[in-house]
Amino acid sequence: MKKISILIMPALMAGMAFTSCSDYLDVDKYFYDQMTLDSAFSKRQYVEGWMSNAFEPIDQLAESDGITRFLSDDIVKYDGHDLQNGNYSASTNNGRSEELLYKGYECIRKASTLINNVDRCPELTSSEKEDMKGQMRFVRAYAYWALLRHFGPVPLVPEEGMNVSLSYEELSLPRVPIDETVNFLDNDLKIAARSLPLRRTVNNMGHPTRGAALALRARLLLWAASPLMNGNKDLFNVKDKEGRQLVPQEYDEAKWAKAAAAAKEVMNLDMYSLYTIEPSPTTPDYERPPYNAEYSDKKFPDGWADVDPYLSYKSIFDGTIQGSKNPELIFTRTKTGGNQINYWVKESMPRTLSGNNSIGVSQKQVDAYLMDNGQTVAEAKQSGYYREDGFTTSASALNEGGAPFLPAGVSWQYAHREPRFYASIAYCGSIWKCTSASEKGYRNQQIFYYRDLNDGKQGFKEDCPLTGIGFKKFVNDEDAFTTGGYIIDKTEPTFRYAEILCIYAEALNELTSGKEYSIEGYNNEPVLVQRDAAEMRAAMKPIRMRAGVPDFSDMTYNDSELMRAAIKRERQVEFVGENSFRYYDLRRWKDALIEENQPFMGCNINISNDESRVQQFYRPTVVASMPKVFIQKMYLWPFTTTELKRNTNLTQNPGW
C-alpha cells in the first residue's frame, strides 16, 4: 500500500481529536473507506469526492463564523464577555481558535495531496486536472491566510509532504518567516489564477475562479504590507527556536505596490462591478439623497441619479439578489456561508419576533455613519443639522415632525443619516417587517429596547442588545421566525468587488508621490502602479455614489494622512458585520491598542420608556458589563499550551 505523504482526514474520522502534532502534519492512510492512494485517484468520482472533501474545512475558516466577529469595537454579543474582557490565555484558549488551527492544516493537507496526485487519474482531461489543481491552490492559500492573520507566522508544510518514517521530533515543523510564507502563497495564487476559468456555472458557484484567486492574493498582500507585518519592531521577539526573526523588522514600501498591483489585476479582468438598483418610480423624493448639484443629476458612477442607494446596498446582503446574478460577488462559500448569514439574522431578530435578540451595535459604529448630506456627526452638530434631543412625531417625512426612513417615536439623532445606516442599524424604534409571518401581529412591528419591555433589559438579565442598538444588515423584509414565516436564502459575500476597490485605493495611498513601481503580474506581464489621486478617486468614488454620499474632497485625495483616515472610516461603514473585517483591520493597522481600549459605548439600557426619563436612554453610556481590554500581546493569538507540547519546534507569540 502506497503511503500518503500529507494527512487527509476522512469523513468518518472528522470528529476525532488530534493526539499529537504529527496528527496534522503527518500521515493518515485513509480516505473515506481506507482506500490506497492509488485507488483514491484512479477514478473521476473518487477525485471529485476528494476535492469536495478538501473544500469542507473552508466552512470553518470563514470569518463570518468565528470568535472574532463580536470582539472588536463595532458589534457585541451579550454572551461574549470573557473574550471581550481579554480573559483568554495559552492554557485557557477558546476552543474555536484551536479548531482554526486544526481545520486550517486539514485544509492544507487535503489540498496538497490532490495537487500532487491528481495527474494519476486517467479519466480526467489535462484541462480538468489543471482546474482542480488551481482550485486546491486557492483552498490551500485560503487556509494559510486564515492562520496567518490570526496567529502571525505559522509552520509551512512542505509541498512534497513528509516521510512518516521520520522521528517525532523531525516531524515537528517550526514557524516560517512571514515574507517566506507570503512569497510562497503569492506565487501559488499566481499559478492558480493562470489555471482557473474566469466564470463558473451557477451549479459551481462555490468553486473559485481566476478572480477569486487574484482577490485572495490582493487581500493577503495588503495584510503583508500593513504596519502589523511591515517593519513592526513591536514584534521583534517573534522568533523561531533558532532565534530567527519571523516578522520583517524593516519597512518596505514596495509591499504596498504589490498589493495595489494585485488589486488592479482583479479590476483589469473587467468581470466585476458594484451592484446597483435604479430608483422605483414610486420612491418618494424625500427618500432620495438631498439634492447635490455635483452628483444628483449625473448617472452612476459619476453621480446617483440612476441609483437607489438604500436598496442597492441592502440587497447585496439580504438575499434580494442571488449570488449568481450579483456582478459584485467574486467568491462565496455555498455550503454553509448562507447558513452563517442566517445565523446573524436569528441573533439579530428581536425576542418579540422569536429571534435571539443578542447583537448590539456600538455608539462608535453609529457615529461612523455620515449624515445624508455628507457631513460627519461632529460637523453636523456644529452646523445644527444634527439633533440629539426629541423624537419624531410623524411616520411621514412630508409632515412636520417626520424624517426620511423613520417612523414616529424615534430619537432625532437617527434622522438624516446616510442610506447605509438605515440598511444596517436597528436603532431603538425601528420597524421589523417580517412580511412572511402568517399572523398579522408579527408583521411590521416597531421594536424598542427600553428597560422592562420585551426586547429590552429585564431585571438583571442582559439577554438583549447591550447597547440598545440592534443590527439588521442581513435581514430581509420577508424574514420571520414566527408561525408561517420563512427565511430568505442568502449568499455570503466572502469576496466582493467593493473590497478590491478599497484595497487598491489604500495601497496606492501609501506610495511615495511621483514614484512608479513595476510589479510582475500573475500572467508575467508588468503592472504599473503609483500614487495617483485620479486612480484612487476612480476606485473610491463609485462606492460613495452607490451609497448616496458625496465623494471625498480633492484635499483628501491629495493628502495621504487624510486619505488614510477616510479609507479607514469607509471600510468601517461599508463592511460592518462582514468577514470580521473591523477586528482584523484594527490589528493590521496597529490601531487596536487605541481603538479597542476605549470604553464600549451605547445607549443606557437601564432606562425605561417613562416619559420623564426616556431621553436619558440615548445619552452615550459605557456598557459596564462589557469592559474592553486590549494589550500589546493581543495583536496575535496564542498557540495553546497543549499544541506547544505536541510540537516541540513551535514557538509561542510574545507575552503569552
Regions found by a protein language model. Give the residues of each.
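Conserved, well-structured interaction surfaces
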Residues: 39-60, 80-151, 168-210, 410, ...
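Long, intrinsically disordered, low-complexity segments
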Residues: 21, 104-107, 184-186, 260, ...
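Short coil/turn linking the two alpha-helices of tandem helical-hairpin repeats
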Residues: 148-149, 155, 220-232, 510-514
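Flexible, polar/acidic helix-loop-strand segments at domain edges
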Residues: 327, 339-496
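Membrane-proximal, proline-rich intrinsically disordered regions
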Residues: 21-68, 412-415, 639, 643-656
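Bacterial Sec-dependent N-terminal signal peptides
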Residues: 4, 15-41, 185, 218, ...
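Extended amphipathic alpha-helical segments enriched in small hydrophobics
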Residues: 141, 217-218, 489-547
